[in-house]
């Protein structure tokens, strides 16, 4: 079956099984032969310790998957938009510095944001995974493609439709707003990947770093966009480096509202998946 097998007990006759298992859990009060054969010694002789170890191992694994879903949506959308934008007469909607910010800042802070998600007892009801099972499951791939496609469609609609262009004073302001929209949409998707169900806001208090990082990235974006307003050369340098110009409050509201569509779109996908089961 190619599954990872754990074995536990404390007797001399259990030593061969403890040794052959992928992970042998020997009881602390067991025989010396059993303790020598085991990989891990349970000092409190409590089966709950084994259960907790499995739970937190699965939590780490699921948090890695959450980050992968979060980051792959960003990368797919950024690549597709950058590659196909010239065919629509759009030159560099995401500058090199924008892509560096998205990959460096969003990568590192996104790992902190999702890496500390709390353990859920539901993880213990998951089926065992084969050794050769792909990290990206069909369900995970479907979510990545669904949300990546929506972010791409949202991007091209924002960049090509006159109704959005009319909201800004010029192309520079519109492209700055698009950079903001892309980052905010990615952050909104961070809520989506927290849960495979509908409880995307559940247990936010158990991971205070999530909202801190979320708010921190928004503040960093505000600092970058409004840097040219500073009465010194540093502000002008930051604005030139990121090709950003200050946008009016209405532009911020529009970017937030469009980015927030990431939430109902993924909830719709989850509802369809549940209905088709």
Where would I find each of the regions flagged by the language model?
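Alpha-helical segments flanking ligand/cofactor-binding loops in enzyme cores
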Residues: 15-16, 32
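Cytoplasmic-side transmembrane-helix entry/capping segments in multi-pass membrane proteins
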Residues: 202-211
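Juxtamembrane/interfacial segments flanking transmembrane helices
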Residues: 120-123, 192-202, 229-239, 272
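Hydrophobic mid-bilayer segments of alpha-helices in multi-pass membrane transport proteins
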Residues: 178-181, 212-217, 255
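Cytosolic catalytic headpiece
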Residues: 1-13, 19-22, 64, 86, ...
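Alpha-helical transmembrane segments
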Residues: 186-190, 225, 262-270
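Membrane-embedded transport module
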Residues: 1-6, 21, 28-198
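Hydrophobic alpha-helical transmembrane segments in multi-pass integral membrane proteins
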Residues: 154-158, 217-235
